[in-house]
Amino acid sequence: SEMCIRDSIHTPQTICGRLNDMLDLARAIDRYIVFYNGPRCGASAPDHMHFQAGNKGFVPLEYLWSDIYREQGEAVYRDGDILLGRLKRWPQSVFFVESGQMDRIAEAFDLLLRLLPVLNGDTEPMMNILCTYEAPVWRLWILPRRTHRPTQYYEEGDKQRLISPGAIDLSGVVPLPRKSDFERFTKEEIVDIFMQVSLTSEETNRICKEWRKI
């Protein structure tokens, strides 16, 4: 099942100043994975603050995490309280944070937020975020990006694909509104779409060098 958790007051969709809310929510409903889609990153209500949540065991990035981390995880920084890392071979740029201390997670996230590029007209870096809580540890995945939609979205005829990837898509489950897209999609095209919307590997490497200075 999936749910939407909206702010009762009309406020913009932004993660700035709201990460602790996300961590608190993940702890309160720890049977679920909580996710955040930026305003131009697949958000269902791009102008109103909300998180979404779904059952754990639904997206591969979460339920296959131990295998994924073993095969392509790379620690960027580690001490007794926190682990910062990234995935080396996921088609989409992925940073992750693991810690049992909310303040350390917030510190690491705030630094990453300052390192990520902000595009013209945006108020925060484009990103999707997923969060789980397995007592006593939170795990946060941050998926930074550089564009809202892939070129395939704007094609015509058989080349068009109606996809605006959000957190769920980039974590390995790609819901499609049209049967024709489902029938034509190839693995290679999905990888291409993920890479189009993601930060480049060069940008990711640069950010990692700075992020480890926490």
How should these model regions be labeled?
Residues 3-5:
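Short, small-residue-biased leader/transition segments that mark boundaries at the very start
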Residues 8-20, 25-45, 54-214:
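Conserved His + Asp/Glu catalytic blocks
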